Structure formats: C-alpha cells, structure tokens
Amino acid sequence: LSAPPKLTLKTMANLATKWSWGIGMLGAKRRGFGNIVGHVKGISDTSSLGSWTAEQFDPSLDWDKIAKLKEQWGGKVILKGILDAEDAKMALKVGADAIIVSNHGGRQLDGALSSIRVLPSILEAVGDQIDVHLDSGIRSGQDVLKAMAMGAKGTYIGRAYIYGLGAMGEAGVTSALNIIHRELDTTMALCGETNVEDLGRHNLLVPKDFEGRWQEYVGAGNA
C-alpha cells in the first residue's frame, strides 16, 4: 500500500474481491494532512508530501548538532528514540532535559529491542539525573503501570488512540484514553496502590535476566 494508492494489477484484483468496500470508499471524503498540506511551501497535495517528509531527516545529525540546537533554541529539549544506556549518557551530556526510551513503535527496525526491556539499564545509567519516559508497546493501563513501576516518569501512546480515532473520531480518542485510565486505576487497586508516585519494583515480578546479557554477547563476538 502506498500513499497515494497506486492502481496495479495486484491492487485492482484485491479491490475486486472487496467491491462493496470500494464503492463506499469512492463516496468517502478525501483525507489529507491538514496541518501540512497547504501550509508548507511546495506541499499542495498528498503526492508531494512523501518527498517533503524524506527531506526532513538529516543523516548528518550527531550529538554536537543536538548540543548546538539546544543552545540556539534556549528551551527544553527532549530526545526520543533512546535504546541504549550509552546514548542516554550522551543525551545527558549534550543538555537534554528528558529522554524517551522508544523504538518508535517497532516500525523502524524490526529487530530492535523492546523499550521496556532496555528501560532498567537506562534508568540505572541516568535515571537519577534526567527524567526518563517510555513509549512503544503501551496498549493498556497495565502497561502504563509496568513502565512506571520500573521507574519511568511517564508513558506515551500512539496506536491505542489511533484505533479509537479510526473507529469513532474524536469521541473514540476520548474513549481510548478513558479505557487506559480505568485499566490503570483498576490495576493499581489490585496492587494495593492509590498513588502512581508510590509505584515501584515491589509491584512487579521481573523475570531473571529480563534485560538479557547483550553486552556480554557482543564482547564475546568481538574477542
């Protein structure tokens, strides 16, 4: 599937098996990125959006540039996508005000470690010096509790509210947030907690060697 969709023999054959859905979609309102199309120079439709998006990624970005950005901006800088304790230390060194432990929902690199698995080592490295948040894999209130009990200051969601948006629009987003809130409330009650600030490792049973011995294996491979 591409954006915008391209009519190929394969997609046409697929559409032929779903003709009722196809007819319904023909009469549906056209969707676009209203916060970008028509507001950014040179972006007038969805077709030109892809090229513009690709141009926003700077392959030469490094820690020195982040430090310079922090200096020029003068405001708070939060770095998302940290999956390694050494990167967390570098984020602290260049002046980041907080970091988000994230593998971007697992949609950038299929083999990336899960955020929750690397969270303990990152907290051990910098958790007492910088706020550490987490996203990727948060689907329920129980997931929120697990992350915060391990030491994250907060969590973020993506797909969870998008599902609600797709099903019911704005009301669906509100419903998704309420569901997660109720799940968190219920889970806390069953754990004997009334305040998220009181959550901790005592609320969890973490499997032995949960983080894995990744560094040891890497070292052995380089020996």
Predicted regions and their residues:
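Active-site entrance/lid segments in N-terminal catalytic domains of soluble metabolic enzymes
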Residues: 1-93, 105-108
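Alpha/beta catalytic cores of nucleotide-metabolism and tRNA/nucleoside-modifying enzymes
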Residues: 32, 117-135, 139-223
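Short loop-to-alpha-helix "cap/lid" segments that border enzyme active sites
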Residues: 61-66, 71, 113-127
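Short, well-ordered secondary-structure micro-motifs
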Residues: 89-90, 110-112, 144-146, 167
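Glycine-enriched alpha-helix->loop->beta-strand junction motifs that scaffold or abut catalytic
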Residues: 72-76, 92-106, 126-129, 151-155
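Glycine-rich, proline-tolerant flexible connector loops at the mouths of alpha/beta enzymes
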Residues: 50, 103-113, 162-165
